[in-house]
């Protein structure tokens, strides 16, 4: 969004990545006027590891307690993931499972893999 010279905003969020989009979503939920700006047009690609662990959902659930199941319903954008496997050049591997702090949090997969373009766009439009 581009603000004209006549528009005044008390809150301006610079950057519509995950942090900026989440801040905007929380402000919108509370009915607090603000402006979210970014130098890029969305959706846009961003280099990233693309993994969303359970720690991400600790924050996302504060916005929407059902967000894990909503993301899980979009399987073409958010692939379920139960952990990570690191493989060394010599072929040795290390499995790192995603774990939940409580069994109540396991209403879906422990995490997701999603291209950053799709994750950012999802949050930006939330």
Question: Residue ranges of each PLM-predicted region?
Answer:
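Beta1/beta-strand and adjacent pyrophosphate-binding region of the FAD-binding site
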Residues: 2-19, 35
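Small-residue (primarily alanine) positions within well-ordered alpha-helices
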Residues: 16-19, 23-24, 28
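Short, well-ordered alpha-helices that flank and scaffold nucleotide-derived cofactor binding pockets
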Residues: 25, 29, 58, 125
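N-terminal FAD cofactor-binding segment of flavoenzymes
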Residues: 45-90
